[in-house]
Design a protein with these regions (language model features):
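Pre-Walker A-like glycine/lysine-rich segment at the N-terminus of P-loop NTPase domains
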Residues: 1-47, 54-61
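Residues immediately C-terminal
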Residues: 44, 262-263, 295-296
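Phosphate-coordinating catalytic segments in nucleotide- and nucleic-acid-processing enzymes
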Residues: 48-238, 242-246, 337-347, 351-353
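Conserved SF1/SF2 helicase motif Ia
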Residues: 251
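Walker B motif beta-strand of ABC-family P-loop ATPases
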Residues: 254-256
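Walker B catalytic acidic pair
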Residues: 258-260
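Helix N-cap at the start of a conserved alpha-helix in ABC-type nucleotide-binding domains
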Residues: 266-267
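C-terminal lobe/lid and adjacent interdomain/linker elements of RecA-like ASCE P-loop ATPase modules
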Residues: 270-353
């Protein structure tokens, strides 16, 4: 099941329309327009669906609509949260309404029910036979993975506080330990393509509470810990390990990566970006990455872009779906993808409409 549209608003900011999502996606925009907020919002919605803690829940209000494609079915799930209560909730399948809820009543398949005010209906009506679509949404949420690329810190050793995942919190050691020799070799070969001259990756158990990942680099005598690597190398290698780990697990429903490429040089940003986007397309993993990195923008086709602009509390997504002429006309300018973003082309085009 794939997320095809994401709509969201809260007390201090709102998407003016739903963001359409494809198999792979790049969120771009200037600083402080809302790229990280969009990724964090999807993460928070996954948490709420799973009844996990939502540490960044807005104090007063948020509302979201998630639209999925499941083979031939279109599933649209909407809910609104206000003052610790669910004030709206609806579920439609191919345009047919199965669930409606407001502050006065809740109808599920035409029957009146009374879910607790602070619970989604799918929390209290789980049944794989009677309500299979609830289970599909929950399974989707269980398989949302993510990573804050810019917060991967070599000083954290095996800790992975940078990960955005409601239920999957495996650390670096656990991921490497679970991989076969072939998978480890895949990571080494991918690292070498990025000009990181790794020769070996292995785990080391000193005592029960001290478990390490050890790296061997060409022409370096001593073994290296993750904390011995440069910040850029640490970020790239951590992403490669997660990428391989995900490839041997049940594939994730959605992989969120915030600030992709931050801290890497031109050559490695380009190579890692191509590697990641190609990997996700080939493995059928939906990817949503954010970046304002010049180099990364130039290697990701504009059809996969969502450009965010902000006017006060309103965040405006621009994409080939809602502005086809903007994107199609740009192909004839001869400019680079980054010029599309950084020049006044967009503002001139939108003002002329």
């Amino acid at each position: 099941m794939e997320l095809t549209h994401f709509a969201y608003k809260e007390s201090t900011w709102a998407l003016t329309q739903a963001i359409p999502l494809k198999a792979v996606n790049l969120l771009v925009g200037k600083n402080a327009v809302g790229k990280s907020k969009v990724i964090e919002a999807i993460y928070k919605m996954s948490n709420l669906i799973l009844k996990q803690d939502v540490p960044f829940t807005p104090r007063y209000f948020f509302s979201t609509t998630l639209t999925f494609r499941d083979e031939e079915d279109v599933i649209e799930y909407h809910f609104t949260y206000h003052l610790r209560s669910i004030t709206e909730e609806s579920l439609t399948i191919n345009g047919m309404t199965l669930l409606t809820r407001n502050e006065e009543a809740t109808l599920l398949n035409g029957d009146s029910i009374n879910p607790p005010a602070d619970k989604l209906t799918l929390h209290v009506r789980r049944d794989t036979v009677q309500y299979p679509y609830f289970e599909k949404i929950i399974t989707w949420a269980e398989n949302v993975y993510g990573q804050r690329f810019n917060e991967i810190d070599a000083d954290q050793e095996n800790q992975t506080n940078s990960f955005l995942s409601p239920v999957h919190k495996d650390d670096l050691y656990t991921m490497v330990k679970a991989l076969s020799k072939k998978s480890i070799q895949n990571i080494i070969e991918q690292a070498q393509k990025l000009d990181y001259h790794l020769e070996a990756i292995r785990t080391l158990d000193l005592v029960k509470s001290v478990k390490l990942v050890i790296f061997k680099e060409k022409d370096v005598k001593d073994n290296l810990l993750i904390s011995s690597l440069s910040k850029g190398m640490c970020r790239a290698i951590s992403l490669l390990i997660q990428m391989e780990y995900l490839s041997v697990q049940n594939k994730p429903s959605l992989w969120l990566i915030d600030d992709l490429g931050e801290g890497l040089d031109y050559d490695r940003t380009v190579k890692l970006g191509k590697l990641l986007f190609d990997f996700c397309r080939e493995r059928g993993i939906q990817l949503l990455a954010s970046s304002n990195d010049t180099f990364l923008m130039d290697i990701v086709d504009l059809q996969y872009w969502n450009i965010l602009e902000r006017k006060g509390e309103k965040v405006i997504p621009l994409n080939i779906t809602n502005n086809p002429n903007l994107f199609e006309d740009f192909k004839f300018t001869g400019l680079s993808n980054f010029d599309f973003f950084s020049s006044d082309y967009i503002s001139r085009h939108t003002q002329a409409k």
